Amino acid sequence: MPTIFVDGQEFQVKEGANVLEACLSAGIDLPYFCWHPSMGSIGSCRQCAVVQYQNAEDTNGRIVMGCMTPVSEGARFSLNSGSGADQDSPSAVDETAIEASVQAPIDVPTKVPDKGREFRQAVIESLMLNHPHDCPVCAEGGECHLQDMTVMVGHRDRRYRGLKNTHRNQYLGPLISHEMNRCITCYRCERFYTDYAGGTDLSAQASHDHVYFGRHQDGVLESEFSGNLVEVCPTGVFTDKPLLKQYSRKWDLQSAPSICTGCAVGCNILPGERYGKLKRIHNRYNDEVNGYFLCDRGRFGSGYINSEERLNYAGVRDFNGEFTAIKAQEAIEIAARWMKAEEGEKTQKIVGIGSPRASLEANYLLRELVGKEHFAAGFGDRESQVVHRIAAILKTTRAKNPSIKQMETADAVLILGEDVTHTAPRVALGLRQAVRNKAHELAKQAGLAVWQDAAVRNLAQDQRSPMIIVSATETRLDDIASQTVSLAPQEIALFGHAVARAIAGQPSDDEAVNEAAAALKNAQRPLVVSGSSMLHSAIVDSAAAVADALTDLFQADSTLANSTPADSSPIDSSPIDSTPVSCNSMLSFCLPECNSLGLALLSEEQETLSRLLDRAEEIGVLVILENNLNRRLSEEQVTKLTSSGIKIIALELLDNDLLANCDLVLSAASYAESEGTLVSSEGRAQRYYPVFPAAHERLASWQWLRDLAAVSGHSELAELQHFDQITAACGASNPLFAALAGVSPDHNFRSHGQKIPRQTHRASGRTAINADVSVQEPLRKLDPETPLSFSMEGLNRDQPASLTPFYWSPGWNSNQALQKFQSEVNGPLRGGPVGQRLIEPQTNGISQSSDFTPLRIVQEGRWQLVPMHRVHGSDELSARTAEVAELAGEAFIAISSELAAKLAVVDGDGVKINVAATAGIDSLGLSLSVKILTRVAPNCVAYSAGYSSTLALQPGALAELSKDSDWQRATPQLIASDRSSHANASQNNPPSPDTDIDKGREEPRHV
């Protein structure tokens, strides 16, 4: 590690780092704007200027940009010293001189004590020339990086008295608000949106000193990661629009560490609450999983928690089918009475249905309450087959199931059957970084540091690491793929097995197969990605076969297996980890819901919904845990279940169609109001904590089940009083869950003798927050189940990383304060890892390769239905958030341009879909809107999966298509304006060009 000197102090720094990164990692506050740890350096803002000296005798030095200057052995720099390289107390600034400079009249220049600081102050002053004086009304106020840096450099008075450049703002959709006047042209937004996330509809548009960041015209941002602009932007240009509707300042938000429930990736999040409402979601850094970024479903998809359709009280249905709200204790007693046989009566058979969106602890309690043999996981039949198959593969494979950080090191990627951007969005963002490993390799050969972002991109141009996508339809990653192949699901499985054989030395007659095999064989860290979206277990088998073949290849060639990987990211160039060299091959699966893998490991295919239906007459009581069976069973199957005389008890968050047929409904708390453990698709168990107490008589599902067990006479479960005890019991029940106890500290943990506060020390209005209801000062809510408190009292420091509720440090009020919680910039958090991996690769794993012979289902005049998932609309809960529902649009049928011509339809027309009756499924007919795709597998059409109107469609079914002449096209969505001149004007009427949208400022000098 090189040794450098900063203001006379000696620091050992990371090899290959730049000066800015080295200073921040050492705890030195050096201002910056354009640099970002995940996006590298471009040196555009000039804010991180430091003075570099040639040697110890040099007293003049020269100004260099910290983010563009690599560290070297013995290098000498100064941030605050004006007297040369060898000042004894360099960090001590001449406060008298600074005070004099601040208090001096603005028209009389006063000398600043050193040229580095003077330069940084000049940069801030120039950035402020056109910046508005609107901090009190800016949504970024109080967590603004520009505010922090302005204070840090000591700039206070503005000398510029001229007119400011002003801009018109754009409508960018329901998620992002745009205020261009606050821009400081750091280029972070464009670099993230275009360079990092692959977006194409936001850019820098400029003419001399007039720079505008936005779209070419108003419209919804197309990227699935647009919400990250809120955190990437150091000012208030891009802000959280849903938050603006119910705004609270950062310091007033109550937060807790949590896990996103939008998909199975397991991204770490920080939900914020005020007035009993979930206000927003911010990214919670986890260097192994989501890093600095979230997808838009994860960031904006939790609005359903504030929905008026939330269940506040338990309800029991009477003989007339009407529900009556009852107290929680009464509901428990009714349920226990149903579950216990009265004297002389036959013992009731109790069956439980779990849920892949409920916590591991809640599913465990339900399984123990009803017995393993009477517990169904709650997957649909085909989903159950695929998910359990994935779980079996992960438990036995020799390949590594990688984290997203490890995926970013891949130098060749094969994707089988998944549109990853829509089924595991954060994984897709990681794969976009993986294809840049070719650029990093070229940079290394040219002697460029990979953090020199602009230079590396200019060097590589369009050269990328190979990515082969084999799918039924176009995907959002097609733009970076080296090869795309369009095949039906059963043919995708055949393709995968053919690639495995080609890797093993049996070439195929299909050149596409041989090209894919060659790309994987020539890679040092190949990655195979597949998943459950096609509901086709043969596809996941073929992915496992490819990973097995690659592992065999690495084991046969120890030289290749032990080779040192090339640099893989702007900061981190470490190998995968200490896993045996046979695990250089990586295998990752995309799963449908947040706890799908955890539930599969817990249930082990003990019961399926079909088998449960076959013996419905034997069941006395059915307990359904957070599972809307209308999404997993056909209408006929649901009717059969609910009309069989079974007493149905449902635990649920939101009202849905199934609940109308239940006898007792228990109001469950959401993830933001309860604690639990989720197992991600990586096999990482992670804990989430309540952000605020559950309102009314909502209880966490595990609390309902614990109380029900106690009243119904289940003595063993009745002894489990605390959540930690349930987690420990679950861990003891299965060797795979043995690490659960180490996921997070128990409820007795204290930091410096106190619980960890969920509120900042600046939280306001504690005694007056409910004054509109009662003037009586409310008691602080207690939380006996976690190490966190619903209070500002305590210390948010030195605790395990899994317990950090928010990021703040003196002088760092924005989310950039994160670097004060990291062991090094862009490195792991202090306080240990977040979560525990439950599944590791097996040294002597069982091969999953198997022969597969597909059924030939092509029929003239019929097309095979394949599911097409959407990041907005396919998920059950997030789709009930207003903004997500707006983006989801209507359900659709996606077809090729050739088929569209044959049917004489265009985008937006209607198509009738007729599906013939098959075993157990009646014939079906419906009409859907047409979406025309650039590529679709032959003889296939895709439908929007997860939408309520397409739930009856079955993957693989054959459908007849015809134009619907009676179809009514959807009303075009007009572009809305955020700045209407009339308070009651419709949002769908944009202002005219003559509208004065900023009356409080000078007249615009340009638009």
Range-by-range predicted roles:
Residues 46-261, 265-269, 274-281:
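Fe-S ferredoxin-like electron-transfer domains
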